[in-house]
Curated annotation (Swiss-Prot):
Modified residues (Methionine sulfoxide): M144
Signal peptide: 1-18
Region (Specificity for association with VLDL) residue spans: 268-280
Disulfide bonds: none
Protein name, as recorded: Apolipoprotein E
């Protein structure tokens, strides 16, 4: 990561060596400005800048439609919207990267932020100058002070070429600085993750040792408590067995007393009922005897035949 950052810084410094474009005479062929294809598929700010670039390229054609709209405020209004969208996306992306620069040293972060802010301001100034130049052209066309429309268009085309080239240069400079900013954020994030990983590893090891140191006394206390509990259970079991024997003896004593009382009660009942039974038997025998006597007395004697 450090090597990548160093390469990006060298590239950034090399890109800052901008050549001053000489002024073009009217009718002189314009040098070809390479198209930034990378703006078509990148960060949101790059896409927004690509839309500004495409619109500027259309204006630079100075077609009849362009010249007609230049006489109104249509073109400058469109450029204003595109410029504001681009700068808004640049600020959003910069803020996103700043949030990732937490672990980076404050002096490095301040330096990178200052350089990035300057590149951002240059890009905004380039777009602002394009808009101002088109506004100036509209005023010149409306006044036409000793100049022909052809001369005004040629001068505008020359200025737009220079501004377009400067815009491309400053956009690439901003792009490189943002790349450096992002590389710093990634390196800082990796450092932070590495530090967190080391810290967590240390905490885990400390926790493991502390747990081992704490668990040993706990195991010893649990073992001692188990021994005491086992002894207490054996003691309680012995007491319960002794108590059970006592209860069994008491139950035997109660059973013997109950049997004794039952036998006594049975003997008492027998003593009560035997005389009554004998008396009833005697009375019954006497009654039967009386009945037999009465029956015999009432029967007539048989008569003799003469």
């Amino acid at each position: 990561m450090k090597v990548l950052w160093a390469v990006l810084v060298v590239t950034l410094l090399a890109g800052c060596q901008a050549d001053v474009e000489p002024a073009l005479e009217v009718g002189e062929p314009a040098p070809e400005v390479r198209e930034p294809a990378m703006w078509q598929s990148g960060q949101p700010w790059e896409l927004a800048l690509g839309r500004f670039w495409d619109y500027l390229r259309w204006v630079q054609t100075l077609s009849d439609q362009v010249q007609e709209e230049l006489l109104s405020s249509q073109v400058t209004q469109e450029l204003t919207v595109l410029m504001e969208d681009t700068m808004k996306e640049v600020k959003a992306y910069k803020s996103e990267l700043e949030q990732e620069l937490g672990p980076m040293a404050e002096d490095t972060k301040a330096r990178l932020s200052k350089e990035l802010q300057a590149a951002q301001a240059r890009l905004g100034a380039d777009m602002e100058e394009v808009r101002n130049r088109l506004t100036q052209y509209r005023s010149e066309v409306q006044t036409m002070l000793g100049q022909s429309a052809e001369e005004l268009r040629a001068r505008l085309a020359s200025h737009l070429r220079k501004l377009r080239k400067r815009l491309l240069r400053d956009a690439e400079d901003l792009q490189k600085r943002l790349a450096v900013y992002k590389a710093g954020a990634q390196e800082g994030a990796e450092r932070g993750v590495s530090a967190i990983r080391e810290r967590l590893g240390s905490l885990v090891e400390q926790g493991r040792l502390r747990a081992a140191q704490t668990s040993q006394p706990l195991r010893e206390r649990a073992q001692a408590w188990g021994e005491r509990l086992r002894g207490r259970l054996e003691e309680v079991g012995g007491q319960a067995r002794d108590r059970l024997d006592v209860v069994r003896e008491q139950m035997e004593e109660v059973r013997a007393k109950v049997e004794e009382q039952a036998e006594a009660f049975q003997a008492r009942l027998k003593g009560w009922f035997e005389p009554v039974v004998e008396d009833m038997r005697r009375q019954w025998a006497e009654l039967i005897e009386k009945v037999q006597v009465a029956v015999g007395a009432s029967t007539p004697a048989p008569s003799e035949k003469h």
